[in-house]
Amino acid sequence: MLGDLFTKPKKRKYATIPSDGTKADVPEGIMTKCPECKKIMYTKELQKNLMVCNYCGFHHPIGAKARIDMLVDEGSFEEIDANLTTANPLGFEDYMDRIEKDKQKSGLNEAILTGHATIGGNPLVIAVMDSRFRMASMGSVVGEKILRAVEDADKTNKPFVIFTASGGARMQEGMLSLMQMAKTSAAFKRFSNHGGLVITVMTHPTTGGVSASFASLGDYNFAEPGALIGFAGRRVIEQTVREELPEDFQTAEFLLKHGQLDDCISRLDLQNKLSFILSIHVKTPEVGGEADGE
């Protein structure tokens, strides 16, 4: 009995049974797991639902081209300023290598896609930011493309609609990126002074210099449900004000509740909503005066 206490236990032997190869081979990308409710669904079904979760309504991120395809009238989109590409004015190390990788990943030359289109037959100039490209940070080219798009809307007498999704100003361009905040805001103001209509739709995430400049300067300011919208990060604010912030702080729903948004609109309803707003703001030619030769 006592001897058993000092006896080494015998090691259990295990045998590895080879797989018979009958395990189902699931192609990559065929299923998508919702990060919010953790439910798994077919990717094709998710795409049919405009990348909105069928179970909880979570809005999955989408690229600029996909958003335009699901929003504007088929075949109506005509891109503008596609030739504008980023330089490296500060000589930031490996910046251009990162830009090239993002070009391949997103299929875009920059973090924003701009052009003319129609929604429900209503003409507009549209701009869509793409978070796959440098987290849609605003550098000199992004600012320039927004400026030119707004000026195009002004010249052609069309409304301007912009979808924002950004991590803020692009640090690799330093002061040049910060200048875009004033540049874009001034363009919005000039357009507004000329009677132009601006609609902003903030998507997840809209933060930093973009949220602090043009993102909230629309005549209508909308957001997708659950979008993170704010300037500084939650922890930075808590450490500054020395207070615990509400759980839903910096969400689209929180901003709507406190009067900083006009509406929080599901992606599934956005096309109809925009079509209606654009239709009631159509500018008609003035009757009489010089137009009639008087």
UniProtKB/Swiss-Prot annotation:
Keywords: ATP-binding, Cytoplasm, Fatty acid biosynthesis, Fatty acid metabolism, Lipid biosynthesis, Lipid metabolism, Metal-binding, Nucleotide-binding, Transferase, Zinc, Zinc-finger. It holds the Pfam family Carboxyl_trans. Residues 30-294 form the CoA carboxyltransferase N-terminal domain. The gene is accD. It is found in: Cytoplasm. It comes from Listeria monocytogenes serotype 4a (strain HCC23). This is Acetyl-coenzyme A carboxylase carboxyl transferase subunit beta. Its EC number is 2.1.3.15. One of its GO terms (cellular component) is acetyl-CoA carboxylase complex. PROSITE patterns: COA_CT_NTER. It catalyses: N(6)-carboxybiotinyl-L-lysyl-[protein] + acetyl-CoA = N(6)-biotinyl-L-lysyl-[protein] + malonyl-CoA. Zn(2+) binds at C34, C37, C53, C56. GO terms for biological process: fatty acid biosynthetic process; malonyl-CoA biosynthetic process. Pathway: Lipid metabolism; malonyl-CoA biosynthesis; malonyl-CoA from acetyl-CoA: step 1/1. Component of the acetyl coenzyme A carboxylase (ACC) complex. Biotin carboxylase (BC) catalyzes the carboxylation of biotin on its carrier protein (BCCP) and then the CO(2) group is transferred by the transcarboxylase to acetyl-CoA to form malonyl-CoA. Its main location: cytoplasm. Acetyl-CoA carboxylase is a heterohexamer composed of biotin carboxyl carrier protein (AccB), biotin carboxylase (AccC) and two subunits each of ACCase subunit alpha (AccA) and ACCase subunit beta (AccD). Gene3D superfamilies: 2-enoyl-CoA Hydratase, Chain A, domain 1 (3.90.226.10). Binds 1 zinc ion per subunit. It is an enzyme of class 2 (transferase). Belongs to the AccD/PCCB family. InterPro entries: AcCoA_carboxyl_beta (IPR034733), Acetyl_CoA_COase_Trfase_b_su (IPR000438), ClpP/crotonase-like_dom_sf (IPR029045), COA_CT_N (IPR011762), Znf-ACC (IPR041010). Transmembrane segments: none annotated. Its cofactor is Zn(2+).
